[in-house]
C-alpha cells in the first residue's frame, strides 16, 4: 500500500513539473530610426526562476553614444503577473547594475478560447518598476 501511494504521489509531482507555464523564454524589443538611433531591450526568463535583462542604446550625438545596461535576479509568477526580485549581495556587480526589485510585468497572450483570426503577439508589459524607462514597456516573446 505504501509503495502504491508513493508511486502515485511521484507520478503526480512529475506531471506538475512537466507542465510548462509558457512564461520562460526570450523576449525582445527594438526601436530604431534610420541613421539616428537604435535601442534594444532583451529579457531572458529561465525555467529555474532566474532572469537576465540587457538594454543597448546607440544614439547619434549622444553622450556617451553607446550604452549597455544589465540586470539580473529571480522571477516568480502568480496568475499572469510576473514579479522580479534582485538580491543586493548576489545580483549586483560592476556589470549588473539595474535594480528590478518590486518590478512587475503582466503576461499577455491570446486566449485559447479566442477563435478569431486576429493576431495577438505574446508579450510582457511592465506595469510597475522603479526604473522609469522600463515602466509601461512592452517586450515581445521571440
Residue ranges and their predicted role:
Residues 19-72, 85-142:
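Lipid interaction determinants
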Residues 78-82:
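Short, conserved beta-turn/loop elements at beta-strand boundaries and strand-helix junctions
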Residues 1-24:
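Bacterial Sec-dependent N-terminal signal peptides
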